[in-house]
Curated annotation (Swiss-Prot):
It comes from Polistes dominula. This is Venom serine protease. Residues 1-19 form the signal peptide. It comes from the Eukaryota. Disulfide bonds join C60-C76, C192-C207, C216-C246. Belongs to the peptidase S1 family.
Amino acid sequence: MNCGKIILLFITIIGVAKSREENCKCGWDNPSRIVNGVETEINEFPMVARLIYPSPGMYCGGTIITPQHIVTAAHCLQKYKRTNYTGIHVVVGEHDYTTDTETNVTKRYTIAEVTIHPNYNSHNNDIAIVKTNERFEYSMKVGPVCLPFNYMTRNLTNETVTALGWGKLRYNGQNSKVLRKVDLHVITREQCETHYGAAIANANLLCTFDVGRDACQNDSGGPILWRSPTTDNLILVGVVNFGRTCADDAPGGNARVTSFMEFIHNATIGETYCKAD
C-alpha cells in the first residue's frame, strides 16, 4: 500500500473542500418545545428533505448539502434509473405531509440529475446525490447541513447521534405523518460485524443501536446527525441504509459520510458548501 498517495489524496480532498467554503450558515436547528417526544418541532431541522414517488406509500429521506443538491441512499433511486426518475420529486421544508397549513416553506422540486455511487450494491456504498432543477430557497426554516470536513478522522463510537424521518412507526406498520427524531448511539465496527459480517460491516458503514429505538422502513436515505461539541452545528455523519427489522436486537446500518466525501465532491462540482463557524 502506498501510504504517500493515500495521505496526498486525503489532503487534496480537504483542500478542495476548504477552497469551496463560504461564511454562510449550516447545520443549525430551531429550538424544540417538545419534551421527551419523538415528533420534531415544525421545521426544527431545516436540512431535512423527502423524496416522494409516483407509487403511493413509498418515501425516502434526504439531506440538503448545497442550494441544489441533497444526499440520500442509492437504493431509493436505483430501480428508477430506467424511467429517468420520472415522477419523483424532492420536498423540503415539510413537517406533516398530509397538510400544508403548519408551515409556509414547504416546496416541491423536480429532479435534474441523479448520481449513484459507481460501486453501489445492496449493502455497500449505498449513497446517491440528487440535483434539482431549481435552487432551494434558503431561510431559517430551510438550509444545508454541515458536512464533516473537520471531522474526517474522528472516532464517533459511543457518541449520540440523531436519526430523522417519516418512516414507519413499527415494522410493517403505518408511516408517520410528521417528521420524527430518535437518538441513537454509534457502536464499534466489531459489534456490527457480529450481526452482519465483515463484508457488510466494513469501514464505510456507520452502525447505530439503542434498545427499542431505530430508524425504520421509509426512513432510508435520511440523515444521521451528530452535534459538534465545539461549534454546536449539526454534522451529517451518516445516511440511513438498512436494518434487520425496526428496533430489534440488531443495529442499523448507515453510509459513513466521511468515507464518501470525494464522491460527494465529484457529484457537486461547481457548488459551494457553507462552513461551520
